[in-house]
Amino acid sequence: MHIESKNRQIKKDIVVEITKKINDSQSLFLAEYRGLTVAKLLNLRKEAKKHNVEIKVYKNRLVKLATQKLGHSDLDKFLVGPNLFVFSNELGMDGAKVLAEFAKKNKKLVLKAGIFDGKVVDAAGVKAVAELPTYEEALTILASSLLGPLRQISLSFKLLVDENKLSN
Protein backbone atom coordinates (compact mmCIF):
# COMPACT_ATOMS: atom_id res chain seq x y z
CA MET A 1 0.00 0.00 0.00
CA HIS A 2 2.82 2.38 0.87
CA ILE A 3 4.57 1.73 -2.46
CA GLU A 4 1.35 2.42 -4.38
CA SER A 5 0.90 5.84 -2.78
CA LYS A 6 4.57 6.63 -3.45
CA ASN A 7 4.14 5.72 -7.14
CA ARG A 8 1.00 7.84 -7.32
CA GLN A 9 2.93 10.82 -5.91
CA ILE A 10 5.74 10.28 -8.43
CA LYS A 11 3.18 10.32 -11.26
CA LYS A 12 1.57 13.48 -9.88
CA ASP A 13 5.01 15.10 -9.79
CA ILE A 14 5.60 14.09 -13.41
CA VAL A 15 2.25 15.62 -14.45
CA VAL A 16 3.27 18.85 -12.68
CA GLU A 17 6.63 18.74 -14.52
CA ILE A 18 4.94 18.23 -17.90
CA THR A 19 2.46 21.03 -17.20
CA LYS A 20 5.31 23.37 -16.28
CA LYS A 21 7.31 22.41 -19.40
CA ILE A 22 4.32 23.09 -21.65
CA ASN A 23 3.70 26.45 -19.97
CA ASP A 24 7.37 27.48 -20.06
CA SER A 25 8.13 26.42 -23.62
CA GLN A 26 7.23 28.22 -26.84
CA SER A 27 5.73 25.07 -28.35
CA LEU A 28 5.31 21.33 -27.97
CA PHE A 29 5.44 18.78 -30.77
CA LEU A 30 5.09 15.04 -30.66
CA ALA A 31 6.20 12.27 -32.96
CA GLU A 32 6.01 8.50 -32.92
CA TYR A 33 9.44 6.91 -32.76
CA ARG A 34 8.49 3.23 -33.17
CA GLY A 35 11.32 1.32 -34.86
CA LEU A 36 14.04 3.96 -34.44
CA THR A 37 17.34 2.66 -33.10
CA VAL A 38 18.88 4.05 -29.95
CA ALA A 39 21.73 5.48 -32.05
CA LYS A 40 19.28 7.39 -34.25
CA LEU A 41 17.41 8.69 -31.21
CA LEU A 42 20.72 9.90 -29.78
CA ASN A 43 21.44 11.71 -33.06
CA LEU A 44 18.01 13.35 -32.86
CA ARG A 45 18.69 14.45 -29.27
CA LYS A 46 22.08 15.93 -30.29
CA GLU A 47 20.50 17.86 -33.14
CA ALA A 48 17.73 19.09 -30.85
CA LYS A 49 20.23 20.28 -28.26
CA LYS A 50 21.95 22.46 -30.91
CA HIS A 51 18.66 24.33 -31.36
CA ASN A 52 17.82 24.62 -27.64
CA VAL A 53 15.07 22.05 -28.07
CA GLU A 54 14.38 19.44 -25.39
CA ILE A 55 13.19 15.92 -26.16
CA LYS A 56 11.47 13.86 -23.48
CA VAL A 57 9.62 10.56 -23.38
CA TYR A 58 6.62 10.40 -21.05
CA LYS A 59 3.70 8.06 -20.60
CA ASN A 60 0.91 9.26 -22.86
CA ARG A 61 -1.59 9.07 -20.00
CA LEU A 62 0.46 11.53 -17.92
CA VAL A 63 0.78 13.95 -20.85
CA LYS A 64 -2.97 13.63 -21.38
CA LEU A 65 -3.60 14.68 -17.77
CA ALA A 66 -1.31 17.70 -18.19
CA THR A 67 -2.78 18.82 -21.53
CA GLN A 68 -6.33 18.44 -20.23
CA LYS A 69 -5.42 20.58 -17.23
CA LEU A 70 -4.16 23.26 -19.66
CA GLY A 71 -7.23 23.11 -21.91
CA HIS A 72 -5.57 21.26 -24.81
CA SER A 73 -7.67 18.09 -24.74
CA ASP A 74 -7.70 18.20 -28.59
CA LEU A 75 -4.24 16.64 -28.35
CA ASP A 76 -5.61 13.50 -26.63
CA LYS A 77 -6.40 11.65 -29.87
CA PHE A 78 -2.72 11.81 -30.88
CA LEU A 79 -1.46 10.37 -27.60
CA VAL A 80 -1.26 6.72 -28.65
CA GLY A 81 1.81 4.61 -29.35
CA PRO A 82 5.41 5.35 -28.42
CA ASN A 83 5.72 9.14 -28.58
CA LEU A 84 8.51 11.53 -27.92
CA PHE A 85 7.71 15.06 -26.86
CA VAL A 86 9.70 18.02 -28.17
CA PHE A 87 9.71 21.29 -26.25
CA SER A 88 10.98 24.42 -28.04
CA ASN A 89 12.50 26.78 -25.53
CA GLU A 90 13.45 29.78 -27.69
CA LEU A 91 11.83 29.86 -31.12
CA GLY A 92 8.51 28.07 -31.34
CA MET A 93 9.20 26.55 -34.73
CA ASP A 94 12.59 25.06 -33.84
CA GLY A 95 11.14 21.83 -32.49
CA ALA A 96 9.07 21.31 -35.62
CA LYS A 97 12.08 22.10 -37.83
CA VAL A 98 14.28 19.58 -35.99
CA LEU A 99 11.61 16.87 -36.18
CA ALA A 100 10.71 17.51 -39.83
CA GLU A 101 14.36 17.53 -40.92
CA PHE A 102 15.06 14.30 -39.03
CA ALA A 103 11.87 12.66 -40.38
CA LYS A 104 13.02 13.35 -43.97
CA LYS A 105 16.04 11.09 -43.40
CA ASN A 106 14.36 8.63 -41.02
CA LYS A 107 10.97 7.49 -42.29
CA LYS A 108 10.24 5.65 -39.03
CA LEU A 109 9.85 8.95 -37.18
CA VAL A 110 6.23 9.98 -37.74
CA LEU A 111 5.18 13.57 -37.05
CA LYS A 112 1.84 13.51 -35.25
CA ALA A 113 0.77 16.81 -33.68
CA GLY A 114 1.70 19.65 -31.39
CA ILE A 115 0.77 22.84 -29.64
CA PHE A 116 1.93 25.96 -31.46
CA ASP A 117 0.86 29.51 -30.74
CA GLY A 118 -1.59 28.20 -28.14
CA LYS A 119 -3.42 25.95 -30.61
CA VAL A 120 -3.31 22.21 -31.25
CA VAL A 121 -2.00 21.38 -34.74
CA ASP A 122 -2.01 18.04 -36.57
CA ALA A 123 0.86 16.50 -38.59
CA ALA A 124 0.20 18.84 -41.53
CA GLY A 125 0.30 21.76 -39.10
CA VAL A 126 3.64 20.58 -37.70
CA LYS A 127 5.05 20.44 -41.25
CA ALA A 128 3.68 23.92 -41.97
CA VAL A 129 5.28 25.28 -38.78
CA ALA A 130 8.58 23.64 -39.78
CA GLU A 131 8.50 25.57 -43.06
CA LEU A 132 8.02 28.96 -41.38
CA PRO A 133 11.03 31.22 -41.82
CA THR A 134 13.14 32.13 -38.82
CA TYR A 135 13.24 35.77 -37.72
CA GLU A 136 16.47 36.33 -39.67
CA GLU A 137 15.07 34.64 -42.79
CA ALA A 138 11.91 36.74 -42.55
CA LEU A 139 13.99 39.93 -42.32
CA THR A 140 15.99 38.87 -45.38
CA ILE A 141 12.79 38.22 -47.33
CA LEU A 142 11.38 41.59 -46.26
CA ALA A 143 14.58 43.43 -47.14
CA SER A 144 14.82 41.85 -50.58
CA SER A 145 11.16 42.60 -51.31
CA LEU A 146 11.73 46.25 -50.37
CA LEU A 147 15.00 46.56 -52.29
CA GLY A 148 13.57 45.25 -55.59
CA PRO A 149 11.27 48.23 -56.26
CA LEU A 150 13.93 50.68 -55.04
CA ARG A 151 16.39 49.25 -57.56
CA GLN A 152 13.82 49.67 -60.33
CA ILE A 153 13.19 53.31 -59.35
CA SER A 154 16.91 54.11 -59.24
CA LEU A 155 17.41 52.40 -62.61
CA SER A 156 14.54 54.46 -64.06
CA PHE A 157 16.12 57.70 -62.78
CA LYS A 158 19.49 56.67 -64.19
CA LEU A 159 17.91 55.98 -67.58
CA LEU A 160 16.18 59.40 -67.50
CA VAL A 161 19.44 61.15 -66.65
CA ASP A 162 21.29 59.26 -69.39
CA GLU A 163 18.52 60.07 -71.87
CA ASN A 164 18.69 63.79 -70.97
CA LYS A 165 22.48 63.79 -71.44
CA LEU A 166 22.11 62.25 -74.89
CA SER A 167 19.47 64.75 -76.00
CA ASN A 168 21.57 67.76 -74.86
Swiss-Prot record:
InterPro entries named among the record's database cross-references: Ribosomal_uL10, Ribosomal_uL10-like_sf, Ribosomal_uL10_bac, Ribosomal_uL10_bac_type, Ribosomal_uL10_CS_bac
Single GO term (MF): large ribosomal subunit rRNA binding
Gene Ontology cellular component annotations, sorted alphabetically: large ribosomal subunit
GO biological process, one term: translation
Keywords annotated in UniProt: Ribonucleoprotein, Ribosomal protein, RNA-binding, rRNA-binding
Gene3D superfamilies: 3.30.70.1730
Annotated coiled-coil segments of the chain: none
Main function: Forms part of the ribosomal stalk, playing a central role in the interaction of the ribosome with GTP-bound translation factors.
Family label: Belongs to the universal ribosomal protein uL10 family.
NCBIfam families to which the protein is assigned, alphabetical: PRK00099.1-1
Assembly, per entry: Part of the ribosomal stalk of the 50S ribosomal subunit. The N-terminus interacts with L11 and the large rRNA to form the base of the stalk. The C-terminus forms an elongated spine to which L12 dimers bind in a sequential fashion forming a multimeric L10(L12)X complex.
Record HAMAP family: Ribosomal_uL10 (MF_00362)
Identification of the protein by name: Large ribosomal subunit protein uL10
Annotated source species: Mycoplasmopsis pulmonis (strain UAB CTIP) (Mycoplasma pulmonis)
Gene for this chain: rplJ
